[in-house]
Design a protein with these regions (language model features):
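Substrate/cofactor-recognition hotspot
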Residues: 153
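Beta/alpha (TIM)-barrel catalytic core signal, keyed to glycine-rich beta->alpha loops juxtaposed to Asp/Glu
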Residues: 1-145
Length: 155
């Protein structure tokens, strides 16, 4: 339509994308690549769940999930199981859960940028460092194995 009307075409879309929500891969990534549209991945840490700070039912006092408890997309049993599996995978490979989650997103061919949301300097540093990591084939296979057992628990 943009071509026919002489308008600028879309060059990016902003969709949720994380280890817990990979629905973008189902059709959208292929179309986006074909059309030259990049993904600005938002909520890459799944509201903080993929950082590991909510493991074992923890609820830090100032966390968004604690302050806004009605946001339960990531607190269902399937998401909690997958989150724990990803955290354990990260630990087995000497990574933090945050590093695993962000490095995975960085390595997807259709992602052009990732929207991060740090609330302090330490989080910002960890987020930035994660983009310097290239996950090994072994780690990527581990991620895929978890995804196959529990695909998209928080779409």
């Amino acid at each position: 339509i943009a071509e026919q009307l002489g308008l600028s075409k879309f060059v990016s879309v902003q969709n949720p994308y994380s280890l817990l929500n990979r629905t973008y891969e189902i059709g959208m990534s292929e179309i986006a690549k074909y059309e030259g549209v990049g993904l600005l991945a938002y909520s890459p840490l799944a509201f903080g769940y993929l950082t590991g700070k909510f493991r074992n039912g923890a609820r830090p006092a100032n966390a968004r999930v604690t302050l806004f408890s009605r946001f339960s997309r990531y607190s269902n049993p399937e998401s909690e199981w997958a989150t724990e599996q990803y955290a354990q995978l990260a630990e087995r490979h000497g990574l933090t859960p945050t590093q695993l989650a962000l490095a995975f997103i960085k390595q997807q061919f259709f992602v052009t940028s990732t929207i991060i949301g740090a609330t302090n300097l330490d989080q910002l540093k960890e987020n930035i460092q994660a983009f310097e990591i290239d996950l090994s084939e072994d780690v990527l296979q581990g991620i895929q194995a978890i995804h196959q057992q529990q695909p998209n628990p928080a779409p």
